[in-house]
């Protein structure tokens, strides 16, 4: 038998009845990426990222997914930004060295060192100490009654509820309510109820 004489075997399989609507089949075909689309998508993405059909949603049709930059990802500064930072740092170094030169010249002429720098350091130390005291005061110590806050004059207590009548030290209700001593050594006398 010659190879030319061989017949091709063809299987005739009846096509299964399509359960999908022809419009749905067309939409699926449109969503399926073509090799050209895959090439276009991979051309724009970084080499590590592969374009996969899982990244697409059904509503996008045949357009490639628009990628948003990840806000958490590190993006290196541009060349212009680096050059700008270098010029700023060079300017600040030049200004600092000029100020040091001026101070050196003044000291050579006999001017004393400025006290402003020392005063600023002392003020910063005082601020840190006062902040530490405030923190210690807010924590309180064990067994101490907690206060609600610190006023300008010192700690203040929570005001009484509004439903109770306010009492100051001179009111008659408060004086009657307290036991009074008639003479030292005697027992307190309670006022008789009216």
From Swiss-Prot:
UniProt keyword terms in alphabetical order: Acetylation, Cytoplasm, Phosphoprotein, Protein phosphatase inhibitor
Family listed: Belongs to the protein phosphatase inhibitor 1 family.
Compositionally skewed regions (Basic and acidic residues) per UniProt: 41-63, 160-170
GO BP field: behavioral response to cocaine; cellular response to cocaine; DNA-templated transcription; locomotory behavior; negative regulation of female receptivity; response to amphetamine; response to morphine; signal transduction
PTMs per UniProt: Dopamine- and cyclic AMP-regulated neuronal phosphoprotein.
Annotated stretches, region: Disordered: 1-194
Localization: Cytoplasm
Function recorded in the entry: Inhibitor of protein-phosphatase 1.
PANTHER family cross-referenced by the UniProt entry: PROTEIN PHOSPHATASE 1 REGULATORY SUBUNIT 1B (PTHR15417:SF2), PROTEIN PHOSPHATASE INHIBITOR AND DOPAMINE- AND CAMP-REGULATED NEURONAL PHOSPHOPROTEIN (PTHR15417)
Cellular component aspect of the GO annotation: cytoplasm; cytosol; neuronal cell body; nucleus
Protein name: Protein phosphatase 1 regulatory subunit 1B
Annotated positions of the Phosphoserine modification: 45-46, 97, 130, 192
Bias (Polar residues): 84-95
Compositional bias (Acidic residues): 113-131
Keyword Cytoplasm: yes
Main location class: cytoplasm
Residue positions where N-acetylmethionine is found in the record: 1
Organism: Mus musculus
Pfam families: DARPP-32 (PF05395)
InterPro entries the UniProt entry points to: PPP1R1A/B/C (IPR008466)
Keyword RNA-binding in annotation: no
Modified-residue entries (Phosphothreonine), positions: 34, 75
